[in-house]
């Protein structure tokens, strides 16, 4: 069974963990629809990136009409 050869001190443990912090998100507004999106990513609301539509949006289906 593997066990540590030497005890890891609090200082060494904390120095190792110094780079593990999470970075807060920095959302930007989409120039096409105004929704918040991640920088350098396609907008999830409208599918635009760099003033072009790169992901076609599916037509919305009204479930109330199809149920009857």
Swiss-Prot record:
Gene Ontology cellular-component terms for this entry are: large ribosomal subunit
Keywords of the record, alphabetical order, are:
Ribonucleoprotein, Ribosomal protein
Which Pfam family, an example, fits this chain? Ribosomal_L32p
Checking InterPro entries in the record gives:
Ribosomal_bL32, Ribosomal_bL32_bact, Ribosomal_zn-bd
Any idea which GO molecular function terms this record carries? structural constituent of ribosome
* Residues forming coiled coils: none
Q: What Gene Ontology biological process does one annotation of this record name?
A: translation
Q: Which domain of life is it from?
A: Bacteria
- Sequence similarity: Belongs to the bacterial ribosomal protein bL32 family.
Q: Which HAMAP family does the entry link to?
A: Ribosomal_bL32 (MF_00340)
Q: What is this protein called?
A: Large ribosomal subunit protein bL32
Q: By which gene is this protein encoded?
A: rpmF
